[in-house]
Structure formats: structure tokens, C-alpha cells
Curated annotation (Swiss-Prot):
GO terms for molecular function: aminocarboxymuconate-semialdehyde decarboxylase activity; hydrolase activity; zinc ion binding. It is an enzyme of class 4 (lyase). Gene3D superfamilies: Metal-dependent hydrolases. InterPro entries: ACMSD, Amidohydro-rel, Metal_Hydrolase. It catalyses: 2-amino-3-carboxymuconate 6-semialdehyde + H(+) = 2-aminomuconate 6-semialdehyde + CO2. The keyword Zinc applies. Its EC number is 4.1.1.45. GO terms for biological process: L-tryptophan catabolic process; negative regulation of quinolinate biosynthetic process; picolinic acid biosynthetic process; regulation of 'de novo' NAD biosynthetic process from L-tryptophan; secondary metabolic process. This is 2-amino-3-carboxymuconate-6-semialdehyde decarboxylase. Keywords: Decarboxylase, Lyase, Metal-binding, Zinc. It comes from Homo sapiens.
């Protein structure tokens, strides 16, 4: 069994959001040829996607070809829209979550849903989380690595974490809103470097901000192998010990204490990196994730895990499915 914790999906269509809300900045999907569509922001194309981004039957066909049993589906992070008026973001979240739920209901043995929330308005986010869990049956939600000017240690977000803990709602943290201009404008640097940096900041913010200390039952998984964190945790821990005046303002516990307290996906594209990741984060805490259907993802799901001579079969099976089930609070028999 292979369970992919990290895959993205969009509705086939949605209303003109600029017309609906009266201002720009929204993302639209424009179908321009058979099996292909443009993602537009304020009329400018920023990505072309194929039908596997919105058509579940095409997706299942490709999953079968690659041996993927189940995908956890989440929206494309550019849809988060935390910058917008909260009620408008909530409206969009409801649209996305309802569409996602209909896909999951149609194929319950192949898909699980991770909802999206208006995180810039924590009260609304909690209400939509409750709806996602209680009405739509989602085991978790996807959130961004920051919410406008808030990092994930922001006290304003603590009610969201409290609700997630109470509802047993898992959080999948995905980078977004990277710097795109200036020094980052060339070489695809926002995706190659900016995304791992975003994720590293998110992990450090949650650790040093006391989130894992205050909410010990919170289940969190960070995308892209936890960014640079697994490789730099020694530096982070040493710096914490040397400058507690700067690093221990909100939590006196050394960051290394929290290794094993959270999950990451296994999307690192390199055997040495995957070995380090499992050594640092824990073999029980790393989950197959592909970033399907995008080109920076793992094009042969599970191939890297299966190639690891250092891993016994039990470890490989944990990374391919068991750890995902534990993170999501689901049982294998639901998908067999």
C-alpha cells in the first residue's frame, strides 16, 4: 500500500471571484484546450495545469499506473487567499472544501480530504475546521507556513491549534507566498530555495513559540522533508543554547526536544537526504509525499523509499503507508 500525503487538486471550474467580491488578486482557471488550462492571477498566466489537476478519473488512472493506493488531496497553496477580506476567503474555502468533499465521497477508497481555512480570521477558521471534520469527514486541513505577517507562533493562531487538538484534526503545513522578486527572481529560486526556507521558519516558529509544548497532542506534518530543518537542527539547537535571550523568549525547551513530535513528508529527491531525514525526524514520522501533479514532485511515487538498502521492509512500509495512517488517524482497512 502507498498513501501519498502530499497531492494537490482544484475544482474543474469556479465563479469569477473578482466579479463576486469586487476586487482583484484572485486566481482563476481558464480552460484553453482539451485537457489543459491556465491558472491566471489578475489576467496574467502563472501556471499551466493538465486535467489530472481537476479530473479524479484521470488522477486515479495515473495513480494505478504508479501503484498509489490513496492520495490525501489538498488545494494548490496559491488558493489560500489569506490576504483577502476574511468573509471572502471563507466563501472560497467553502467552495473548495465542498468540491473536495464531493470528490472524496465519489471515491472513498482512493482519496481523503485535507481542507483549507481562512487562517487570517481564526474564529472563522475554527468554524470551517469544525465543518470540515464533522460534516465533510476530513481527517485534516492544509495551512500555509505563515499567515500574512503572522508566523505560526502567533498567539492569534492558538485557538486554531486548540480546535485542531480537540477535533483530532491533523495539520499539513505547506510553504507559500515566497519572495518572488529581487534576488529571487531568477533560476526558479522561490521554489528551489524559498520553499524550504519557508518551511524551516515555520518549524522553528512552532517550536520556539511553544506551540508543541502547549498543544502536545497536535498532529503536524511539514511538506518537502521539513525544508532545511533536518540538516540545520544542530545549528538551531546550538544557537538556542548560546543565545537563550534571543531564542528562548517564549519556550525554554531546546528545539531538539521536539524531534519525534511532528511529521514531515519524504519529498527530498535524494537517498542521503532521506536517510538523514529519518535519522533526525524519526522513522515513525516520515510520510510518502509526491506533490502530484507538479513537476517538482516525486514522479515515481515511493521509488526512493523502496531503493533504500538501509531500510528494512517494516520501515519502508511505515514510510509508504503506516505513518500516513497514524498521522491522519485512519485505519488501513478503510482502503483495502
Amino acid at each position: 500500500m502507498k498513501i501519498d500525503i502530499h497531492s494537490h487538486i482544484l475544482p474543474k471550474e469556479w465563479p469569477d471571484l473578482k466579479k463576486r467580491f469586487g476586487y482583484g488578486g484572485w486566481v482563476q482557471l481558464q480552460h484553453h484546450s482539451k485537457g489543459e488550462a491556465k491558472l491566471l492571477k489578475d489576467g496574467k498566466v502563472f501556471r499551466v495545469v493538465r486535467e489530472n489537476c481537476w479530473d479524479p478519473e484521470v488522477r486515479i488512472r495515473e495513480m494505478d499506473q504508479k501503484g498509489v493506493t490513496v492520495q490525501a488531496l489538498s488545494t494548490v497553496p496559491v488558493m489560500f487567499s489569506y490576504w483577502a477580506k476574511p468573509e471572502d476567503t471563507l466563501n472560497l474555502c467553502q467552495l473548495l472544501n465542498n468540491d473536495l468533499a464531493s470528490t472524496v465521497v465519489s471515491y472513498p477508497r482512493r482519496f481523503v480530504g485535507l481542507g483549507t481555512l481562512p487562517m487570517q480570521a481564526p474564529e472563522l477558521a475554527v468554524k470551517e475546521m469544525e465543518r470540515c471534520v464533522k460534516e465533510l469527514g476530513f481527517p485534516g486541513v492544509q495551512i500555509g507556513t505563515h499567515v500574512n505577517e503572522w508566523d505560526l507562533n502567533a498567539q492569534e493562531l492558538f485557538p486554531v491549534y486548540a480546535a485542531a487538538e480537540r477535533l483530532k484534526c491533523s495539520l499539513f503545513v505547506h510553504p507559500w507566498d515566497m519572495q518572488m522578486d529581487g534576488r529571487m527572481a531568477k533560476y526558479w529560486l522561490p521554489w528551489l530555495v524559498g520553499m524550504p526556507a519557508e518551511t524551516t521558519i515555520a518549524i522553528c516558529s512552532m517550536i520556539m513559540g511553544g506551540v508543541f509544548e502547549k498543544f502536545p497532542k497536535l498532529k503536524v506534518c511539514f511538506a518537502h522533508g521539513g525544508g532545511a530543518f533536518p540538516f540545520t537542527v544542530g545549528r538551531i539547537s546550538h544557537g538556542f543554547s548560546m543565545r537563550p535571550d534571543l531564542c528562548a523568549q517564549d519556550n525554554p525547551m531546546n528545539p531538539k526536544k521536539y524531534l519525534g513530535s511532528f511529521y514531515t513528508d519524504a519529498l527530498v529527491h535524494d537517498p542521503l537526504s532521506l536517510k538523514l531525514l529519518t535519522d533526525v525526524i524519526g522513522k515513525d514520522k516520515v510520510i510518502l509525499g509526491t506533490d502530484y501533479p507538479f513537476p517538482l514532485g516525486e514522479l515515481e511515487p515511493g521509488k526512493l523509499i523502496e531503493s533504500m538498502e538501509e531500510f528494512d521492509e517494516e520501515t519502508k512500509n511505515k514510510l509508504k503507508a503506516g505513518n500516513a495512517l497514524a498521522f491522519l488517524g485512519l485505519e488501513r482497512k478503510q482502503f483495502e
